[in-house]
Curated annotation (Swiss-Prot):
Gene3D superfamilies, A to Z: 3.40.630.30, Acetylglutamate kinase-like (3.40.1160.10)
Subcellular location: Cytoplasm
Protein's UniProt name: Amino-acid acetyltransferase
GO cellular component, one term: cytoplasm
Reactions this protein catalyses: L-glutamate + acetyl-CoA = N-acetyl-L-glutamate + CoA + H(+)
Predominant location: cytoplasm
Top-level enzyme category: transferase
UniProt xrefs under InterPro entries: AceGlu_kinase-like_sf, Acyl_CoA_acyltransferase, Asp/Glu/Uridylate_kinase, GNAT_dom, NAGS_kin, NH2A_AcTrfase
GO biological process: L-arginine biosynthetic process
SUPFAM superfamilies in the record: Acyl-CoA N-acyltransferases (Nat), Carbamate kinase-like
Lineage of origin: Bacteria, Pseudomonadati, Pseudomonadota, Gammaproteobacteria, Pseudomonadales
Amino acid sequence: MPDYVNWLRHASPYINAHRDCTFVVMLPGDGVEHPNFGNIVHDLVLLHSLGVRLVLVHGSRPQIESRLADRGLTPHYHRGMRITDAATLDCVIDAVGALRLAIEARLSMDIAASPMQGSRLRVASGNLVTARPIGVLEGVDYHHTGEVRRVDRKGISRLLDERSIVLLSPLGYSPTGEIFNLACEDVATRAAIELGADKLLLFGAEPGLLDADGKLVRELRPQQVAPHLQRLGSDYQGELLDAAAEACKGGVARSHIVSYAEDGALLTELFTRGGGGTLVSQEQFEVVREASIEDVGGLLELISPLEEQGILVRRSREVLEREIEQFSVVEREGMIIACAALYPIADSEAGELACLAVNPEYRHGGRGDELLERIESRARQMGLNTLFVLTTRTAHWFRERGFAPSGVERLPAARASLYNYQRNSKIFEKAL
């Protein structure tokens, strides 16, 4: 089977889930200048064609720096924010205006060069962001540097209803006609909050948030962000992480940080279960719970490959339906990714741990240990004092977790009578 067929099958639930959702996408000026920009635009057009309501916010910092250099002007910053005097504002307006036109042209060109040629794509922009001056902070006058005061929610929603891609630039206007230079991260965050967006997608140079060892942090709650912000200091990753957390605190369900340098990073994040960047969300990513009858299909999908390999004893749908109350599961985004069952053994104070399975894509996240702890806790609550497990392939895993080798003679009579000598499973036990 071609790989793309398998990918499409796995992506189809996300295609359906994302339709008619509102995504705010923030692309910094560095991302627009990157060689991968064309691929990002193509992916945005693809999202639009799949029914996603798109608001694209672009940055312009390197483009402004270039204009300043051309005019022999020195950029000035305080606390990471540009000080925008009159001469700098002229450069900002020039850079932002040219960049907005270039992005609109690229979006138009991309659809003409794609299989969607002939379909109509409209890009809409305008005075959709009202701003106010930052003013004087710590004795420093920021002049024409501003902050978002209000986003025209009704105006943007109407444009999205008309199937336009809304393009927001890092400029804001005051009721008195002044123009202010804004941070694109601020524009994107406020737009996502005020629109009640389903997602805020933030592009950065890295694959996502990297920890102190350079490893990707895949998931975070907003309340877990503070230590990372302290570690990152003024690093741009910190700005992205702060924006992602603020959006979630403001009601946006999920914020994502992905790489503008990696081809396909946006689609990987949106259409695969594991994603490719960093997800910040108030939602619980995974839940460990008791199984219900609705989980039978997911359990079969999880354990069938292991049954075919002889690792697990075969269980029919009917058996699972009858024994579903014995199972605990780990659910992630509607998918059962791990399970385990506890069977009390008749006429004894012992139980059997059975059918412990974890999806291969999630085997290094401690989910097996989490399920084992849950099964042991359930066993204690039931008054059991010994836990048996029969295994053919994972003996060392259980021994590392306190299970000792045992034998058929140690099994309670009700279980010993059912022992399959042909399968010849190794028997281990653990005192609770």
